[in-house]
Amino acid sequence: MNFRRMLCAAIVLTIVLSIMLPSTVFALEDKSSKLPDYKNDLLYERTFDEGLCFPWHTCEDSGGKCDFAVVDVPGEPGNKAFRLTVIDKGQNKWSVQMRHRGITLEQGHTYTVRFTIWSDKSCRVYAKIGQMGEPYTEYWNNNWNPFNLTPGQKLTVEQNFTMNYPTDDTCEFTFHLGGELAAGTPYYVYLDDVSLYDPRFVKPVEYVLPQPDVRVNQVGYLPFAKKYATVVSSSTSPLKWQLLNSANQVVLEGNTIPKGLDKDSQDYVHWIDFSNFKTEGKGYYFKLPTVNSDTNYSHPFDISADIYSKMKFDALAFFYHKRSGIPIEMPYAGGEQWTRPAGHIGIEPNKGDTNVPTWPQDDEYAGRPQKYYTKDVTGGWYDAGDHGKYVVNGGIAVWTLMNMYERAKIRGIANQGAYKDGGMNIPERNNGYPDILDEARWEIEFFKKMQVTEKEDPSIAGMVHHKIHDFRWTALGMLPHEDPQPRYLRPVSTAATLNFAATLAQSARLWKDYDPTFAADCLEKAEIAWQAALKHPDIYAEYTPGSGGPGGGPYNDDYVGDEFYWAACELYVTTGKDEYKNYLMNSPHYLEMPAKMGENGGANGEDNGLWGCFTWGTTQGLGTITLALVENGLPATDIQKARNNIAKAADRWLENIEEQGYRLPIKQAEDERGGYPWGSNSFILNQMIVMGYAYDFTGNSKYLDGMQDGMSYLLGRNGLDQSYVTGYGERPLQNPHDRFWTPQTSKKFPAPPPGIIAGGPNSRFEDPTITAAVKKDTPPQKCYIDHTDSWSTNEITVNWNAPFAWVTAYLDEIDLITPPGGVDPEEPEVIYGDCNGDGKVNSTDAVALKRYILRSGISINTDNADVNADGRVNSTDLAILKRYILKEIDVLPHK
C-alpha cells in the first residue's frame, strides 16, 4: 500500500507550520516573473492569484476592526490581491494588522523585502519584520518610517537587510494600519507580489500523510461494541472490503453499505459494519481490493478492552497542567518539558493573583456598579489557552469531574482507578482522599475566593465574580509566571453565583465523609450564594464589545432560569430542604434533558437550535442528571421520569447517528447561523455522558454503541481523517491554541502532552486564521485547522477535557458494572443459529452461513453461527443448522 506520497512547494506548509488542512486550502508554487525563485522565499503565499491567502491573516487589537478578502485587481485580468478593509482604526497603529507568521530569520543572512501596496484613500502603513511577542524586537522596519499611500497609486518597495541578531524562529512579517496611520474609515488597502527572499534558504520537502479512503477510529474499538468504518467513495454499488491483521492476513471480509452524500462533509460515503468481529489484537487495517486507488486502505487500529485505559488518565492530567498558583513539576508533569514555575502568585512580572482589584467603573459596566476592593484569588484552573479563570466555565468542568466520582461511588467502583487515593499522578495522592476529588477541590477553593464578603460590599454580599483575567490579551508563547498584564475581577453575575451554589453544594455532599469541616464550609457558602442570587436574579453577564476584556472571553449569559434549577437540584439533594425541592419542582426545566437546546424555551441564545444537552450556558440537564442519579426524596415516578427523559434525548441522538455518514450524534445547527458551532466536539462529548446514563438506567446496549460511535468520530472517523486528541491516532491534534504548548510559535515551547481534545470544526469562521485558511463554502465538518492561532477551532478548555475524561473513564470501566436489568456487555446474548441477527432462526440463516463459508463477502454473527460451540465457524456448523431447521435436532448448540 502507498501510505505516503511526496509533496513539495506550498504544500510543505503542512509540515513547516505543523498543520493539516483540507487540500483545497493550499496555493501551488507560484511562477511569478516579478518575484525571485519560490523555493528561496520564506513566504508561502506571495501573489494570491489562486484566490487563497493563508498564512496571511489579519489581527484586531485595542478597538480595531477589519475584514479581508482576495479580490481581482481591476484592469489586470488574472491578477489578484489581498484586500484589507479597515472598518475601525482603533486606538493604536497595531489595532489593525495583516501578517504572515512562522518565519525564522538566521543570523548573518541577508534578506530582500519586496511588496506592492496601494489604497483607495490617503493613509500610511507601517511595515515591519520582527518578533511575534514581547519584547517585539524589530529586525526590519524601513528605519521606523511608515509608507505614505496615495489613492489609486501602487507603491512598490524593495529593500535589503542583514540579520545581525541571534537566529530567531518567532518572527512575522506585519503591516500596521490602525490608529494615527489610518484614513477615514471605511477604506481599502491592497497587498500583492510580496516576498522575503534569502538565496541561502531552501524550502524543505517533506512527507505528508494522505487521507485514506477508509476512515476509522485511529485508536481502536471495544470488542463488545458495534464497530463501523466509513468509506469515502462515489460508487453507488457495494464495494468489497477486507479486514487484515498486523501480519497482513485477511481475517474478515464483506461488502460495504452505500449511504450516498453525507450532508455535513459533502463526501459520498459507504459504511463497513464489522461489529461481529470481536477478536482482540493490534494493528488491524482495512483494504478495498477492488478500488484502484493509492489510498484504498485505512489507518491501523486496535480491538481491545483497554484502549481507553491510559487515555482516561491522560485526559485527567490536563487539570493538573492547568493549575494556577502552583509549580507544575516532576514527577507529576509527565515529562520535564511540561514543567513550569507557578503562575500568578504575586511575583513580578505577574500583577496577580494575590491582590486583584475590581474592574474600574466605566461605560461598559454603567448598569453594574461595584465598589473598589482587592481579593486574593490565587489557585484554580486556567480556563483554556489563556490565563483567565472563569467561574461559569469552571463550574460545568468541576461538576463533571465530581459527577464522575459520584457515579463511581454509587456504582460501587470508587475504590478503583482515578477515584481512589493514589490513583492519579498529582501532588495530593496518598493523602487519604480520592484523587479526583482532590483535583476538583483545587478549583472549588478558588471559587470560594471569588465570593463577595459583607466587608467588601454588603449590597452584593454572597454574589460571585464572573471571572478574573488579564486587562489585554497576551501573545502566544508566554508561560503564566511571565504574564505582565494587569488583572481585574470582572463584576459579579447571577450565573456565576448559581454555578458556585450548585458546585459547592455538590462538593459538600461528596466531602462530608472525608473532610466534614471543608464540606460544611462549602454548604454554608453555597446557601449564602443561593440567597444572594434570589436577591439579585438578573445581574447578567451580557455581551458588549468590550466584555471580552479584551483579555478574556465574555461568557455572556442573559438567561439564568436553567442555572437556578441546577443549583436548586444540587442543594436539594445535599440538604433535603423543602425550599429547594419546591423551587425545582416548579421550574419550567423540571426533569428536562434537552436533545436540541432551546426547544422548550429558555436556553441561552448562543445555544438555541444546537444539538446537545448542556454547555456552560445551558445547564438544566446537569440538575436532572443529579436527580436521576443520587437518592433523594422526590417521588419514585418523578425519578423514573427523569431517567426516561435522559433515554429519550439519547434516542434522538442515536437517530442522528444513523443519518450521518460519519455516524456522529450532532447535526448542523438549526439556528440562524447553521453549520457546526464553536466547540462542536464538546457537544458530542456531553451527549455521550447522557448516553452513558441512558445505559445505566435502561441496560440497553444501543447507548454504549452510540458512545463508541461518538468516540470513533472524535478519533478519526470523520471528514478530515483527524484525531482531535493529542498523542492518539495516526493524525493526532498537534498544535492547540495554548500559550505554553505552542511549538508553532517557537521551538523552545513543547508539544502538548497526550490526552487533550480540541474544540473541533466550527463553520462560523470566528478567527482570522481559519478565515484565511479555509474557503467559506467548505462543508461544516471540514471547517477546522490544526493551527495554534485558530482559537475558534483548535482551542482547548477545562470544560471540554472534563467530559472527555468522563467518557473515556466510563468506556474503560464499563466491564466493571452490569446495569440494573441489563446485560454484561462483555457477554452479549447468543442466539444459536441466528446468523443474520434478525432474532429468528430459519432458512435465511442457513443461506447466510453458506455464503459466509464460501467467502461470498457477507458479514454474519459468528457467535450465533457457531452452533456446535467449538469456537469455529465452518461446514460442520452449516450441517448442524440445516438439521435444526428441519427439526432433526431439538436444541442448539449441538455437539
Curated annotation (Swiss-Prot):
UniProt domain Dockerin: residue ranges: 828-894
Endpoints of the signal sequence: 1-27
Reactions this protein catalyses: Hydrolysis of (1->4)-beta-D-glucosidic linkages in cellulose and cellotetraose, releasing cellobiose from the non-reducing ends of the chains
Linker, as annotated region: 199-240
Keywords linked to the UniProt accession: Carbohydrate metabolism, Cellulose degradation, Glycosidase, Hydrolase, Polysaccharide degradation, Secreted, Signal
Protein name: Cellulose 1,4-beta-cellobiosidase
GO MF annotation terms: cellulase activity; cellulose 1,4-beta-cellobiosidase activity
One GO BP: polysaccharide catabolic process
UniProt pH dependence: Optimum pH is 6.0.
CBM-cenC domain mapped to chain residues: 40-199
Upper lineage: Bacteria, Bacillati, Bacillota, Clostridia, Eubacteriales
E.C. designation(s): 3.2.1.91
Family designation: Belongs to the glycosyl hydrolase 9 (cellulase E) family.
Active site feature: D386, H737, D786, E795
Gene: celK
Activity regulation remarks: Inhibited by cellobiose.
Location(s), subcellular: Secreted
